């Protein structure tokens, strides 16, 4: 599985099942392959929040916000 989107979808499935730590691993792998995906950082923040990792959640939310604020260019 070398596609960031596949890892993202796996993270979604794991989070829906409450498998938080496994979801973190999937989202982190997704970010390794696609580091500018704001939605992945947002989801990772929610998972960290569920785990009680407040500092990590805040960092993920801030990263998502910064990425989302980038202007679209082509």
Predicted regions: what is each one?
Residues 29-32, 65-66, 73:
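Conserved structural position within tetratricopeptide repeats
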